[in-house]
């Protein structure tokens, strides 16, 4: 299981959105990803997210609407 991949469901651990569920939408480099879902879409340091064992089916750079639909279909929102 690759922990850091597009579609991986994560929990924010730091910041004002700590505790919220999010999804990795794009991997930028070894330290940063773009997240969306239960949080505002933004670049995030990997040290600030905790990957879970859940994954939703998403394309790279999926829109916010596509992310919300995928989370609803998986019963995570």
UniProtKB/Swiss-Prot annotation:
It comes from the Archaea. The keyword Ribonucleoprotein applies. The keyword Ribonucleoprotein applies. One of its GO terms (molecular function) is RNA binding. One of its GO terms (cellular component) is cytosolic large ribosomal subunit. Pfam families: KOW. GO terms for biological process: ribosomal large subunit biogenesis; translation. Keywords: Ribonucleoprotein, Ribosomal protein. Belongs to the eukaryotic ribosomal protein eL14 family. This is Large ribosomal subunit protein eL14.
């Amino acid at each position: 299981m690759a922990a850091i991949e597009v579609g991986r469901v994560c929990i924010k651990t730091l910041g004002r959105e700590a505790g919220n569920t999010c999804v990795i939408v794009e991997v930028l480099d070894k330290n940063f990803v773009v997240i969306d879902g239960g949080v505002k879409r933004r670049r995030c340091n990997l040290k600030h997210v905790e990957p879970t064992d859940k994954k939703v089916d998403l394309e790279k750079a999926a829109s916010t609407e596509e992310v919300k639909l995928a989370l609803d279909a998986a019963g995570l929102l």
